[in-house]
């Protein structure tokens, strides 16, 4: 980041102009890592050093992949399968190691374990019915990871939040295109990458446990 500004946004070798994308992504990633560290501090304070280290390893890996997918889908409108499947496996491991040994047969835990698949199926149905016009299958694969990372209750709310954010941004872009001729190509048929909205919703759900539908109250009955 420092060299980016020190060299005047130019490559040291070819002197070509560099995009603002690079320092912004690096700064955002660094801030994200600090936030993740802060969320895991209670483990460290309580003396659970091994649990802290394992959580940090898994979470930093998960969110590093999320950052890559955010930027990649934003620019290329595609989610690489290799990253999606790797993310899903790591998220599933994260979910499994946080299940109490005496709670495997409880409904909340069973829903959390099944969350990835349960979230993937509606995306797959939309993709299949629309022949890929409404939503990409890559978004469904990303839903696998979201379900296993956040669990059923928070994951479901995070997905709903992602759709709300996506709808709000879509409407805003349509209004901008209607008011400014430079953005006239932004129409109802314009393709907008959805993974960034899914990832933003996931981040909010990770930091602030969400339950839009009061499902946790049902579990308390």
Regions found by a protein language model. Give the residues of each.
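Membrane-proximal soluble regions of multi-pass membrane proteins
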Residues: 1-21, 186-188, 194
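Membrane-interface loop-to-helix entry segments
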Residues: 24, 78-83, 191-196
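Membrane-embedded alpha-helical segments in integral membrane proteins
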Residues: 28-44, 92-95
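Juxtamembrane "helix-exit" motif on the non-cytosolic side of transmembrane helices
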Residues: 39-43, 97-102, 178-180
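Functional transmembrane core segments of multi-pass inner-membrane proteins
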Residues: 46-51, 56-165, 170, 213-221
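Interfacial loop-to-transmembrane junctions
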Residues: 172-204
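C-terminal transmembrane module of polytopic alpha-helical membrane proteins
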Residues: 187, 203-221
